[in-house]
């Protein structure tokens, strides 16, 4: 499959002096730390029921096997699966982890609470779910704890920046499908969103999620996702978060996608056009949902993402 893009970059990259080095080719072996706990979250017998258990939230961390004191850019990736399935160890994500860590990034892949976990949700989400088709209500509700957990993972990364030598000035968040919905929300919304709606009294597991940490997202990778999470945020709370400070985004979407409609991608592109923000646009002709094997000008997704991040973040490539 190839793209019929009308040009990968709508605007030129900002003139950022290169300060952090990555490598065009694989430079190091990759060390992987699996199942690191980044926090805890509640799981209810039914949505918000008093019967609950506490679940560990886990991530895998990929890093170069080298002893340099140089700080490394960070790439957090969120798996898809309709908020009801999927895994941080999905084959394509493992490939991304090895690809980027071998070239100088610290790459993080997370698991998060899904529909079957029934994480704690704000009452206004419960009320709003009454207006969602019955077959989609669980997915709708699971969106909140998924976002909340991704937010916790970003705070964990910030809390461990010294331990892992992380350069928080070059932070990318990406995902596929449902994970891309969450990634877009993480990049566009504010740090208090998907956090302050439930208090520590109602959900004491928040104490395990480094709530004092801060961070800023510098690039978003949207693989066949949408801005649905932001739409819900605006609909329920009146928070319209798009503005001229939003980070550059790379949008990849199959033009024949019947799961997350291609119109979702064009709508997001239009948001960026309206704000005159930088983006890369890759509509994949003839592709349905999840075109992991897509190529544009002979480049796969891994290389396209590499090019986008290094250009937009002003990374020095050797």
Spans of features found by a protein language model:
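Alpha/beta-hydrolase active-site loop
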Residues: 124-162
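C-terminal catalytic histidine-bearing segment of alpha/beta-hydrolase fold enzymes
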Residues: 266-269, 273-318
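Conserved alpha/beta-hydrolase "acid-adjacent" motif
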Residues: 258-264
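Primarily recognizes the serine-hydrolase "nucleophile elbow" in alpha/beta-hydrolase
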Residues: 148, 152-241
């Amino acid at each position: 499959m190839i793209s019929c893009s009308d040009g990968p970059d709508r605007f030129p990259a900002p003139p950022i002096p290169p300060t952090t080095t990555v490598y065009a080719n694989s430079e190091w072996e990759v060390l992987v730390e699996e199942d690191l706990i980044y926090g805890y979250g509640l799981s209810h017998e039914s949505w918000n029921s008093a019967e609950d258990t506490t679940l560990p939230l886990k991530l895998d961390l990929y890093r170069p096997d080298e002893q340099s004191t140089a700080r490394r850019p960070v790439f957090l990736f969120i798996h898809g699966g309709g908020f009801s399935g999927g895994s941080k160890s999905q084959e394509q994500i493992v490939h991304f982890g090895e690809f980027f860590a071998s070239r100088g990034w610290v790459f993080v892949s997370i698991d998060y609470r899904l529909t079957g976990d029934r994480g704690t949700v704000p009452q206004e989400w419960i009320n709003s779910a009454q207006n969602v088709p019955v077959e989609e209500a669980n997915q709708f509700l699971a969106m909140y704890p998924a976002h909340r957990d991704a937010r916790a993972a970003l705070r964990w990364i910030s809390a461990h920046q010294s331990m892992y030598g992380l350069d928080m000035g070059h932070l990318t968040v990406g995902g596929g499908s449902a994970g891309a919905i969450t990634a877009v929300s993480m990049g566009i919304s504010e740090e208090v969103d998907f956090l302050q709606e439930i208090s520590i009294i109602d959900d004491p597991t928040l104490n395990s999620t480094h709530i004092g940490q801060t961070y800023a997202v510098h690039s978003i990778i949207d693989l066949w996702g949408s801005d649905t999470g932001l739409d819900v945020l605006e609909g329920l709370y009146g928070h319209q978060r798009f503005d001229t400070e939003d980070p550059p985004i790379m949008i990849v979407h199959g033009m024949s996608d019947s799961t997350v409609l291609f119109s979702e991608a064009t709508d997001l592109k239009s948001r960026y056009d309206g704000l005159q923000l930088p983006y890369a646009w890759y509509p994949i002709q003839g592709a349905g949902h999840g075109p992991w094997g897509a190529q544009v000008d002979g480049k796969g997704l891994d290389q396209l993402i590499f090019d986008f991040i290094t250009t937009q973040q002003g990374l020095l490539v050797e």
